[in-house]
């Protein structure tokens, strides 16, 4: 049986947040029948302290918890058991820990498991004027659709630029974002670039000073409703 880390909102202590050495972030959605189970796995042989905070689309904290995992122990939280469904209950979840974690994510829609993802890379702290890039695949071919979510996992303002290139490497879309603390933005590429035989390829995100993360939702082309991938590995 899975061990439940916490079954209620616990106020985060300032002391614990200050001692957190590892910072992770990923996407959740509790709107339109969706849910998320978060599996936190201690990758170390000693005790690992963890804290989690869930933010709505505007960056407001709506739920938080703290817990402790013994060496190599897993624990899980089902967000829908602690947070009500709401049109604004989507965006970024942040996890701070005293040592390394592996985070398994099980996404549900209408009670059915639709996607599994794993997050193991920390969200980096950038130096002033330091640039970073995230990149991923998108497709708008046939009945395929891609949406991306850009999220700020920090308590400070973050900015980034998103560029989309077609199959010939030509730029077909770009947008700049300024995100408040823990704020998220959702963009359907159908609205931004339409669809077509050459509308697939590279989605690039550049940032400076403060790091962001993205998630991508794929539908169509045989997907079982929805495929959700978090993009947290920075390529440069």
Where do the protein language model's features map onto the residues?
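Sec-dependent N-terminal signal peptides
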Residues: 4-15
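Gly/Pro-rich, tryptophan- and cysteine-flecked surface segments typical
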Residues: 19-236
């Amino acid at each position: 049986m899975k061990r439940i880390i916490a079954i209620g909102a616990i106020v985060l202590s300032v002391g614990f947040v200050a001692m957190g050495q590892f910072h992770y972030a990923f996407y959740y959605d509790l709107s339109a029948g969706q849910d998320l189970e978060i599996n936190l796995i201690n990758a170390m042989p000693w005790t690992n302290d963890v804290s989690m905070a869930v933010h709505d689309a505007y960056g407001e904290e709506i739920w938080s918890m703290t817990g402790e995992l013994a060496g190599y122990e897993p624990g899980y939280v089902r967000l829908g058991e602690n947070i009500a469904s709401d049109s604004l209950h989507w965006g970024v979840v942040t996890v701070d820990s005293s040592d390394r974690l592996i985070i398994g994510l099980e996404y549900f829609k209408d009670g059915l498991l639709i996607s599994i993802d794993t997050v193991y890379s920390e969200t980096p702290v950038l130096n002033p004027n330091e640039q970073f890039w995230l990149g991923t695949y998108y497709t708008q071919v046939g009945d395929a659709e891609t949406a991306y979510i850009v999220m700020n996992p920090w308590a400070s303002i973050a900015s980034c630029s998103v560029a989309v290139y077609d199959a010939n490497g030509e730029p077909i879309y770009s947008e700049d974002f300024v995100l408040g603390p823990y704020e998220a933005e959702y963009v359907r590429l159908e609205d931004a670039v339409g669809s077509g035989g050459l509308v697939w390829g590279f989605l690039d995100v550049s940032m400076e000073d403060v790091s962001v993360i993205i998630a991508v939702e794929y539908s169509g082309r045989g997907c079982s409703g929805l495929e959700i991938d978090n993009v947290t590995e920075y390529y440069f």
